[in-house]
Amino acid sequence: MDKGFKYNLPRCSCWYWILLIKDRQGFKTGDMKHAICCYNFLRKWLQSHKKFISNPLYITGDSYSGMIVPIITQAISDGSDIEAKRVLNLKGYLLGNPFTYAKFDGNSKIIYYNRMALISDELYESAKSKCKQEYIDVEISNRMCVKDLQTISECTAHINTMRILEPYCPSELPNVRKYLLGTHEDSLHLSDGYPQFGCRNYYCYLCKVWATDISVQKALHIRKGTIKEWVRCNKSMDYDYDVASVVSYHLCLNTRGYRALIYSGDHDLAVTYGGTESWIKSLNLSIVDDWRPWIVDGQVAGYSREYGNNFTFATVKGAGHTTPEYKPKESFSMFKRWISQQPL
């Protein structure tokens, strides 16, 4: 169960963060270092802001944070010293559209394509048989499997990965999402220009224009001359994807009784709800309240399933990657009910 982690927590001093800001080109980080430094920052911040110490603490995130949040949460639960246990009033964690383990998240895409009528039943059954339900680590010598996967790729190459119902828009995605999605190169093309007006990711371009504006930088108290052009994603960063799976962290945290809410947009192709269901099922938790709809303003907002030890999985109907971006009202209702310990 990831033994040894709690004995090797390096300290991240203020100089560490200064180096992060001043030397972006040379900064090297990764999954574990990211999680450890977030943990240490949180612990030290609460020590410096003692009025918040007694507040219930929930760690949250979405997308690739699915690889980071469980590590942070377990680090807090372990406690690197007596002081940490006294300071952090940990109650649980929340994750939306979370990347968790490539084997589950990646293999689920083929199933999702078929469920959403993006590929035919015949093609799905052929790939399922020839690839033996393994679509990530495929032997190049298995030519029939490779051929089916190529056909599937051609059928789905121009589907919007973030939300399959929206128009396909080539987007300037960060490197972390390239790793996360593990899908078509065309849809991951890094545009030299900016997204087409009307595409959802056009707001990323607007953010760049806004943050580069001198008056905005002045209002934010950014030191004059330090940022000539704001960059949303630093592609030069040396990032080490050193954690393959965090499934064991979820199991450990559930065993310790921490509350968990895992939710997915059911039209998200980046991290499909089916992939999330797969790793949750691998935990072998007992089902307390089986699959049922949850309602907002008299309408079905999604579906939920409650597992033992306060572990909840929910889908949000019509939402993409990430869920609150597409369904803010429903997402807030879900969060408000869960944080108040009410049924969804």
Outline where the language-model segments fall.
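Terminal and linker regions of secretory-pathway proteins
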Residues: 1-344
